[in-house]
Amino acid sequence: MQHDDVIWDLIGNKSFCSYKVKTKTQQFCRNEYNITGLCNRSSCPLANSQYATIREEKGQCFLYMKVIERAAFPSRMWEKVKLDRNYAKALEQIDENLIYWPRFIRHKCKQRLTKITQYLIRIRKLTLKRQRKLVPLSRKVERREKRREEKALIAAQLENAIEKELLDRLKQGTYGDIYNFPINAFDKAMEKQDEESESEEEEEEEDEEESGTREFIAEDEFEESDLSDFEELNNLKDSSDEEVNDEEESSEESEEESEEEEVKSKAKSKGKAPLKGPSRKKRAYVEIEYEQETEPAQKSKAT
Protein backbone atom coordinates (compact mmCIF):
# COMPACT_ATOMS: atom_id res chain seq x y z
CA MET A 1 0.00 0.00 0.00
CA GLN A 2 1.09 3.59 -0.74
CA HIS A 3 1.18 5.91 2.22
CA ASP A 4 2.03 9.54 1.44
CA ASP A 5 3.29 10.51 4.90
CA VAL A 6 5.63 7.54 5.12
CA ILE A 7 7.10 8.28 1.69
CA TRP A 8 7.64 11.93 2.55
CA ASP A 9 9.34 11.03 5.84
CA LEU A 10 11.73 8.77 3.98
CA ILE A 11 12.70 10.97 1.03
CA GLY A 12 11.91 14.43 2.33
CA ASN A 13 13.60 14.72 5.67
CA LYS A 14 15.89 11.82 6.54
CA SER A 15 17.14 9.75 3.63
CA PHE A 16 18.46 10.58 0.20
CA CYS A 17 16.32 11.53 -2.89
CA SER A 18 17.84 11.51 -6.36
CA TYR A 19 15.61 14.43 -7.51
CA LYS A 20 16.57 16.69 -4.60
CA VAL A 21 18.94 19.65 -5.16
CA LYS A 22 20.13 21.45 -2.03
CA THR A 23 21.17 25.11 -2.01
CA LYS A 24 21.92 27.66 0.72
CA THR A 25 18.44 29.20 0.59
CA GLN A 26 16.13 26.26 -0.21
CA GLN A 27 15.77 22.85 -1.85
CA PHE A 28 14.71 22.23 -5.46
CA CYS A 29 13.23 19.20 -7.21
CA ARG A 30 14.35 18.00 -10.66
CA ASN A 31 11.39 15.66 -11.25
CA GLU A 32 9.73 16.45 -14.60
CA TYR A 33 6.23 16.07 -13.10
CA ASN A 34 6.82 18.58 -10.27
CA ILE A 35 4.32 21.41 -10.53
CA THR A 36 6.41 24.13 -8.84
CA GLY A 37 10.02 22.90 -9.01
CA LEU A 38 10.39 23.11 -5.22
CA CYS A 39 11.02 20.23 -2.85
CA ASN A 40 8.18 20.37 -0.29
CA ARG A 41 5.31 18.21 0.95
CA SER A 42 2.51 19.74 -1.12
CA SER A 43 4.37 19.83 -4.48
CA CYS A 44 6.18 16.47 -4.36
CA PRO A 45 4.86 14.15 -7.10
CA LEU A 46 6.09 11.00 -5.29
CA ALA A 47 4.56 11.75 -1.87
CA ASN A 48 1.10 12.72 -3.25
CA SER A 49 -1.21 9.96 -4.53
CA GLN A 50 -3.57 12.57 -6.09
CA TYR A 51 -1.52 14.90 -8.20
CA ALA A 52 -1.80 16.98 -11.42
CA THR A 53 0.62 19.02 -13.52
CA ILE A 54 1.00 20.77 -16.90
CA ARG A 55 3.66 19.75 -19.44
CA GLU A 56 4.61 21.05 -22.88
CA GLU A 57 5.54 18.77 -25.78
CA LYS A 58 6.49 20.27 -29.18
CA GLY A 59 4.56 23.48 -28.60
CA GLN A 60 1.43 21.75 -27.28
CA CYS A 61 0.29 21.81 -23.62
CA PHE A 62 -1.02 18.67 -21.86
CA LEU A 63 -2.67 18.12 -18.48
CA TYR A 64 -1.31 15.11 -16.54
CA MET A 65 -3.41 13.67 -13.66
CA LYS A 66 -2.57 10.91 -11.15
CA VAL A 67 -5.06 9.20 -8.81
CA ILE A 68 -4.76 6.46 -6.15
CA GLU A 69 -6.86 3.99 -8.16
CA ARG A 70 -4.10 3.61 -10.77
CA ALA A 71 -1.23 3.26 -8.29
CA ALA A 72 -1.05 -0.50 -8.94
CA PHE A 73 -0.54 0.07 -12.70
CA PRO A 74 2.67 2.06 -13.27
CA SER A 75 2.24 2.02 -17.07
CA ARG A 76 -1.18 3.72 -16.74
CA MET A 77 -0.51 5.86 -13.70
CA TRP A 78 -0.76 9.26 -15.45
CA GLU A 79 -3.82 10.37 -17.43
CA LYS A 80 -2.93 12.68 -20.33
CA VAL A 81 -5.40 15.36 -21.55
CA LYS A 82 -4.64 17.59 -24.55
CA LEU A 83 -5.40 21.26 -23.88
CA ASP A 84 -6.69 23.75 -26.42
CA ARG A 85 -4.28 26.30 -27.92
CA ASN A 86 -6.64 29.07 -26.87
CA TYR A 87 -5.68 30.22 -23.39
CA ALA A 88 -9.22 30.84 -22.12
CA LYS A 89 -10.49 27.47 -23.34
CA ALA A 90 -7.47 25.72 -21.77
CA LEU A 91 -8.32 27.28 -18.39
CA GLU A 92 -11.90 26.03 -18.73
CA GLN A 93 -10.61 22.51 -19.46
CA ILE A 94 -8.46 22.62 -16.30
CA ASP A 95 -11.48 23.64 -14.21
CA GLU A 96 -13.60 20.85 -15.71
CA ASN A 97 -11.02 18.08 -15.15
CA LEU A 98 -9.94 19.27 -11.68
CA ILE A 99 -13.38 20.19 -10.35
CA TYR A 100 -13.08 18.29 -7.03
CA TRP A 101 -9.32 18.56 -6.62
CA PRO A 102 -7.53 20.70 -4.03
CA ARG A 103 -7.46 24.43 -4.71
CA PHE A 104 -3.65 24.54 -4.47
CA ILE A 105 -3.22 22.08 -7.38
CA ARG A 106 -5.77 23.90 -9.58
CA HIS A 107 -4.14 27.27 -8.94
CA LYS A 108 -0.60 25.97 -9.63
CA CYS A 109 -1.73 24.23 -12.85
CA LYS A 110 -3.20 27.49 -14.15
CA GLN A 111 -0.08 29.38 -13.14
CA ARG A 112 2.13 26.85 -14.94
CA LEU A 113 -0.08 27.08 -18.05
CA THR A 114 0.34 30.87 -18.17
CA LYS A 115 4.14 30.59 -17.93
CA ILE A 116 4.29 27.97 -20.68
CA THR A 117 2.04 29.99 -23.03
CA GLN A 118 4.17 33.10 -22.43
CA TYR A 119 7.44 31.44 -23.36
CA LEU A 120 5.80 29.74 -26.38
CA ILE A 121 4.68 33.17 -27.68
CA ARG A 122 8.20 34.49 -27.10
CA ILE A 123 9.69 31.58 -29.05
CA ARG A 124 7.34 32.21 -32.00
CA LYS A 125 8.31 35.89 -32.11
CA LEU A 126 12.01 35.05 -32.08
CA THR A 127 11.62 32.50 -34.87
CA LEU A 128 9.84 35.06 -37.04
CA LYS A 129 12.67 37.56 -36.63
CA ARG A 130 15.78 37.33 -38.76
CA GLN A 131 18.73 36.14 -36.76
CA ARG A 132 22.39 35.75 -37.55
CA LYS A 133 23.58 32.21 -37.79
CA LEU A 134 27.21 31.66 -36.86
CA VAL A 135 28.77 28.82 -38.79
CA PRO A 136 32.19 27.73 -37.50
CA LEU A 137 34.91 27.16 -40.08
CA SER A 138 38.22 25.43 -39.62
CA ARG A 139 41.43 27.36 -40.25
CA LYS A 140 42.49 25.09 -43.08
CA VAL A 141 39.24 25.66 -44.98
CA GLU A 142 39.46 29.41 -44.38
CA ARG A 143 43.04 29.58 -45.70
CA ARG A 144 42.12 27.48 -48.71
CA GLU A 145 39.20 29.78 -49.57
CA LYS A 146 41.40 32.87 -49.22
CA ARG A 147 43.99 31.42 -51.59
CA ARG A 148 41.31 30.54 -54.13
CA GLU A 149 39.86 34.06 -53.95
CA GLU A 150 43.30 35.62 -54.48
CA LYS A 151 44.05 33.37 -57.46
CA ALA A 152 40.64 34.07 -58.99
CA LEU A 153 41.15 37.83 -58.57
CA ILE A 154 44.58 37.72 -60.22
CA ALA A 155 43.23 35.63 -63.11
CA ALA A 156 40.31 38.03 -63.61
CA GLN A 157 42.60 41.07 -63.66
CA LEU A 158 44.92 39.35 -66.13
CA GLU A 159 42.05 38.39 -68.43
CA ASN A 160 40.65 41.92 -68.34
CA ALA A 161 44.06 43.41 -69.15
CA ILE A 162 44.58 41.02 -72.08
CA GLU A 163 41.09 41.70 -73.39
CA LYS A 164 41.59 45.46 -73.17
CA GLU A 165 44.95 45.28 -74.95
CA LEU A 166 43.56 43.13 -77.75
CA LEU A 167 40.59 45.45 -78.24
CA ASP A 168 42.90 48.47 -78.40
CA ARG A 169 45.04 46.75 -81.02
CA LEU A 170 41.94 45.77 -82.96
CA LYS A 171 40.69 49.37 -82.97
CA GLN A 172 44.08 50.66 -84.08
CA GLY A 173 44.11 48.17 -86.94
CA THR A 174 47.29 46.34 -86.03
CA TYR A 175 45.65 43.03 -86.97
CA GLY A 176 44.20 42.65 -90.43
CA ASP A 177 41.93 39.79 -89.41
CA ILE A 178 40.98 38.19 -86.12
CA TYR A 179 43.19 35.26 -85.10
CA ASN A 180 42.54 33.24 -81.93
CA PHE A 181 40.47 36.10 -80.52
CA PRO A 182 37.59 35.40 -78.08
CA ILE A 183 34.33 36.01 -79.90
CA ASN A 184 32.49 37.02 -76.73
CA ALA A 185 34.88 39.90 -76.06
CA PHE A 186 34.59 41.07 -79.67
CA ASP A 187 30.79 40.95 -79.45
CA LYS A 188 30.87 42.98 -76.23
CA ALA A 189 33.07 45.62 -77.85
CA MET A 190 30.77 45.83 -80.86
CA GLU A 191 27.73 46.15 -78.61
CA LYS A 192 29.38 49.00 -76.70
CA GLN A 193 30.15 50.83 -79.95
CA ASP A 194 26.56 50.33 -81.15
CA GLU A 195 25.20 51.65 -77.85
CA GLU A 196 27.44 54.73 -78.03
CA SER A 197 26.38 55.47 -81.61
CA GLU A 198 22.70 54.97 -80.71
CA SER A 199 23.00 57.30 -77.72
CA GLU A 200 24.63 59.98 -79.93
CA GLU A 201 21.88 59.64 -82.54
CA GLU A 202 19.20 59.92 -79.85
CA GLU A 203 20.81 63.08 -78.46
CA GLU A 204 20.93 64.63 -81.94
CA GLU A 205 17.27 63.74 -82.53
CA GLU A 206 16.29 65.26 -79.20
CA ASP A 207 18.19 68.46 -80.04
CA GLU A 208 16.43 68.65 -83.42
CA GLU A 209 13.03 68.09 -81.81
CA GLU A 210 13.65 70.68 -79.10
CA SER A 211 14.89 73.28 -81.60
CA GLY A 212 11.44 73.69 -83.22
CA THR A 213 9.28 73.51 -80.09
CA ARG A 214 7.31 76.47 -78.82
CA GLU A 215 6.41 77.16 -75.22
CA PHE A 216 4.06 79.66 -73.59
CA ILE A 217 5.13 81.01 -70.20
CA ALA A 218 3.01 82.96 -67.73
CA GLU A 219 4.07 86.29 -66.29
CA ASP A 220 4.55 84.82 -62.82
CA GLU A 221 7.09 82.36 -64.14
CA PHE A 222 9.08 85.16 -65.80
CA GLU A 223 11.54 85.99 -63.03
CA GLU A 224 13.96 88.88 -62.59
CA SER A 225 16.88 86.61 -63.41
CA ASP A 226 15.36 86.04 -66.86
CA LEU A 227 15.03 89.79 -67.39
CA SER A 228 18.64 90.32 -66.40
CA ASP A 229 19.65 87.61 -68.84
CA PHE A 230 17.80 89.38 -71.67
CA GLU A 231 19.43 92.71 -70.75
CA GLU A 232 22.84 91.09 -70.87
CA LEU A 233 22.00 89.64 -74.28
CA ASN A 234 20.94 93.07 -75.57
CA ASN A 235 24.17 94.62 -74.26
CA LEU A 236 26.17 91.91 -75.95
CA LYS A 237 24.30 92.51 -79.23
CA ASP A 238 24.92 96.29 -79.04
CA SER A 239 28.60 95.79 -78.34
CA SER A 240 28.86 93.30 -81.21
CA ASP A 241 27.12 95.79 -83.57
CA GLU A 242 29.57 98.54 -82.57
CA GLU A 243 32.50 96.22 -83.15
CA VAL A 244 31.12 95.34 -86.59
CA ASN A 245 30.72 99.04 -87.50
CA ASP A 246 34.28 99.79 -86.35
CA GLU A 247 35.58 96.90 -88.41
CA GLU A 248 33.64 98.13 -91.47
CA GLU A 249 35.02 101.68 -91.08
CA SER A 250 38.58 100.40 -90.70
CA SER A 251 38.13 98.15 -93.75
CA GLU A 252 36.82 101.11 -95.80
CA GLU A 253 39.80 103.26 -94.77
CA SER A 254 42.23 100.50 -95.68
CA GLU A 255 40.52 100.10 -99.08
CA GLU A 256 40.81 103.86 -99.75
CA GLU A 257 44.50 103.82 -98.85
CA SER A 258 45.13 100.84 -101.12
CA GLU A 259 43.34 102.60 -104.01
CA GLU A 260 45.48 105.73 -103.55
CA GLU A 261 48.65 103.63 -103.56
CA GLU A 262 47.55 101.90 -106.78
CA VAL A 263 46.90 105.26 -108.48
CA LYS A 264 50.35 106.51 -107.52
CA SER A 265 52.04 103.36 -108.74
CA LYS A 266 50.18 103.61 -112.08
CA ALA A 267 51.29 107.24 -112.50
CA LYS A 268 54.91 106.26 -111.92
CA SER A 269 54.82 103.30 -114.29
CA LYS A 270 53.42 105.21 -117.33
CA GLY A 271 56.88 105.90 -118.88
CA LYS A 272 58.15 102.42 -118.17
CA ALA A 273 55.83 100.38 -120.40
CA PRO A 274 57.69 97.51 -122.13
CA LEU A 275 58.11 97.42 -125.91
CA LYS A 276 55.89 95.18 -127.93
CA GLY A 277 57.43 92.60 -130.20
CA PRO A 278 59.53 89.49 -130.09
CA SER A 279 62.88 91.25 -129.67
CA ARG A 280 63.26 93.26 -126.47
CA LYS A 281 66.49 94.79 -125.31
CA LYS A 282 67.39 95.71 -121.81
CA ARG A 283 67.85 99.41 -121.21
CA ALA A 284 69.68 101.24 -118.52
CA TYR A 285 67.76 102.47 -115.55
CA VAL A 286 66.99 106.20 -116.09
CA GLU A 287 65.40 108.52 -113.59
CA ILE A 288 63.14 111.22 -115.02
CA GLU A 289 62.21 114.32 -113.07
CA TYR A 290 59.30 116.55 -114.00
CA GLU A 291 59.34 120.27 -113.17
CA GLN A 292 56.32 122.51 -113.27
CA GLU A 293 56.80 126.29 -113.58
CA THR A 294 54.24 128.58 -112.08
CA GLU A 295 53.92 132.29 -113.02
CA PRO A 296 54.27 134.79 -110.24
CA ALA A 297 51.12 136.14 -108.68
CA GLN A 298 51.85 139.84 -109.58
CA LYS A 299 51.73 139.26 -113.35
CA SER A 300 48.45 137.51 -113.11
CA LYS A 301 47.00 140.49 -111.24
CA ALA A 302 48.27 142.99 -113.91
CA THR A 303 46.66 141.09 -116.75
Curated annotation (Swiss-Prot):
Pfam families reported in the protein's UniProt record: Mak16, Ribosomal_L28e
Assigned keywords, A-Z: Developmental protein, Nucleus
Protein's cellular compartments: Nucleus, Nucleolus
Region (Disordered): 189-303
Keyword hit for Nucleus: yes
Domain of life: Eukaryota
Known function: Plays an essential role in early embryonic development.
PANTHER family: MAINTENANCE OF KILLER 16 MAK16 PROTEIN-RELATED, PROTEIN MAK16 HOMOLOG
Name of the molecule in the record: Protein MAK16 homolog
Species the sequence originates in: Danio rerio
Recorded name of the encoding gene: mak16
